[in-house]
From Swiss-Prot:
Belongs to the protease inhibitor I16 (SSI) family. GO terms for molecular function: serine-type endopeptidase inhibitor activity. It is found in: Secreted. Disulfide bonds join C29-C44, C66-C96. The record marks K68, E69 as: Reactive bond. InterPro entries: Prot_inh_I16_SSI, Prot_inh_SSI_I16_CS, Subtilisin_inhibitor, Subtilisin_inhibitor-like_sf. GO terms for cellular component: extracellular region. It comes from Streptomyces eurocidicus (Streptoverticillium eurocidicus). Keywords: Disulfide bond, Protease inhibitor, Secreted, Serine protease inhibitor. Transmembrane segments: none annotated. This is Protease inhibitor SIL-V3. Homodimer.
């Protein structure tokens, strides 16, 4: 099997470089779901369904209603997914948008 092991973070700021890490967890999906993620099995299932595409995981539904304030929340994923190196970063405009778009993967 190809390894899948990640470190996931959530921070307050426009980019990972500008923000402090507020929360961080580990997520391993093969050979079995594990790590410090509170729902490792659910997060791995969601990532597998998305084919490891984090943009699909963080996609916000078009009918989401949030304020238009700029109070950015950034999420990151670093590590290996299905044997490929991953370095992912996504910035949500505010905590409401982050809650709407983080999916199970960034729910910690």
């Amino acid at each position: 099997y190809a390894p899948s092991a990640l470190v996931l973070t959530i921070g307050q700021g426009a980019t990972a470089a500008e923000s402090g890490v507020q929360r961080a967890v580990t997520l391993t999906c093969t050979p079995k779901s594990s790590g410090t993620h509170p729902d490792a099995k659910g997060a791995c299932t969601q990532l597998r369904a998305a084919g490891g595409d984090f943009d699909k995981v963080t996609r916000i539904k078009s009918d989401t209603v949030c304020t238009k304030e700029w109070n950015p929340t950034v999420v990151t994923a670093e590590g290996v997914w299905d044997g490929r190196r991953i370095s992912y970063e996504h910035t949500f405009a505010n905590p409401c948008m982050a809650k709407a778009g983080k999916g199970l993967v960034f729910e910690f």
